From Swiss-Prot:
Belongs to the RecA family. The lineage of its organism: Bacteria, Pseudomonadati, Pseudomonadota, Gammaproteobacteria, Lysobacterales. Pfam families: RecA, RecA_C. Its main location: cytoplasm. Keywords: ATP-binding, Cytoplasm, DNA damage, DNA recombination, DNA repair, DNA-binding, Nucleotide-binding, SOS response. HAMAP family: RecA. This is Protein RecA. The gene is recA. ATP binds at residues 65-72.
């Protein structure tokens, strides 16, 4: 750069600093670039698929899927992991449906959890913004976008048509929230529901969409699509769901990774089940017929018994997890081939 341009830039920078404060504009090389902090999800498979060891702090995350697919369970497990590390968690329950007993079973310290059950969408988002600006919250969950009902809709008649009201509310709120979220280093998770687009018949185009307009799709650094794909049985009794989680957007690591995990009723994501599956894949756990073995020791006949053995021997589970973390680097997880992309994967 020639001297005249340097002087002009120096004058401009000093004027900006005088008007807007020190640090308003800086050279990237002037500050140390730190790795993004992450909060574990409670699923080792998902943490590795996300590429940074969990969900990123200081960012917006969207988790969406059909009903009863495990969205709230996943967020409650992330809250539990955050609390274990001494973090503070808040839950904005716009659906008025949080079960504290179930949350406790997943490891959430319910006594320390900040809970709000707002009356309107504006109130929910204002409370969220105030908590974020306090700089004291490590993780916040808003459940759900679909339940953030604008005040005008609540005060109006049942059949009133108010097109685009919720989308405008979300767009305005995210414009305000995003900067505060970054400054306070808070992880904010929006749970969202699916709706069907009317008249979408184009081949290869998904008729599904999320509620609340397009703003959240753009502001979110990570978007997770979570779906139930099967049942887990113990004899004739169904004890949980087999669940597929797909990373459809990731600004911090390669996207489109996906994992298939187990969510057990009353327990949440099966840590031991994941360890067994990943152990077999990594050839750390041997499977001969119905028997599973680890380190030359038989750990159970059938997956359910092997899961129980690891639960009763936490030191063995911890050793297997350490071996798996060493074996599976985030870059080694490959995208599963042949899967259909769903719900605007390019967003």
């Amino acid at each position: 750069m020639d001297e005249n341009k340097k002087r002009a830039l120096s004058v401009a920078l000093s004027q900006i600093e005088k008007q807007f404060g020190k640090g308003s504009v800086m050279r990237m090389g002037d500050r140390v670039i730190e790795a993004v902090e992450a909060i574990p999800t409670g699923s080792l498979m998902l943490d590795l698929a996300l590429g940074i060891g969990g969900l990123p702090k200081g960012r917006v995350v969207e988790i969406y899927g059909p009903e009863s697919s495990g969205k709230t369970t996943l967020t409650l497990q992330a809250i539990a992991q955050c609390q274990k590390k001494g973090g503070t968690a808040a839950f904005i329950d716009a659906e008025h449906a949080l079960d504290p007993i179930y949350a406790g079973k997943l490891g959430v310290n319910v006594d320390d959890l900040l809970l709000s059950q707002p009356d309107t969408g504006e109130q929910a988002l204002e409370i969220a913004d105030m908590l974020v600006r306090s700089g004291s919250i490590d993780i916040m969950v808003i459940d759900s976008v679909a339940a953030l009902t604008p005040r005008a809709e609540i005060e109006g008649e049942m059949g009133d048509q108010l097109p685009g009201l919720q989308a405008r509310l979300m767009s305005q709120a995210l414009r305000k929230l995003t900067g505060n979220i970054k400054r306070s280093n808070t992880l904010v998770i929006f749970i969202n529901q699916l709706r069907m687009k009317i008249g979408v018949m184009m081949p290869g185009q998904s008729p599904e969409t999320t509620t609340g307009g397009n703003a959240l799709k753009f502001y979110a650094s990570v978007r997770l699509d979570i779906r139930r794909i099967g049942a887990i049985k113990k004899g004739d009794e169904i004890i949980g769901n087999q669940t597929k989680i797909k990373v459809v957007k990731n600004k911090l690591a390669p996207p489109f990774k996906q994992v298939v995990t187990e969510i057990l009723y009353g327990e949440g994501i099966s840590r031991e089940g994941e360890l067994i599956e990943m152990g077999v894949e990594a050839k750390l756990v041997e499977k001969a017929g119905a028997w599973y073995s680890y380190g030359g020791e038989r750990i159970g006949q059938g997956k359910d018994n092997a899961r129980g053995y690891l639960r009763e021997n936490p030191h063995l589970a911890a050793k297997l997890e350490a071996d798996l973390r060493e074996k599976f680097e985030p870059t080694e997880l490959s995208r599963e081939e042949g899967d259909e992309d769903t719900l605007e994967d390019t967003m």
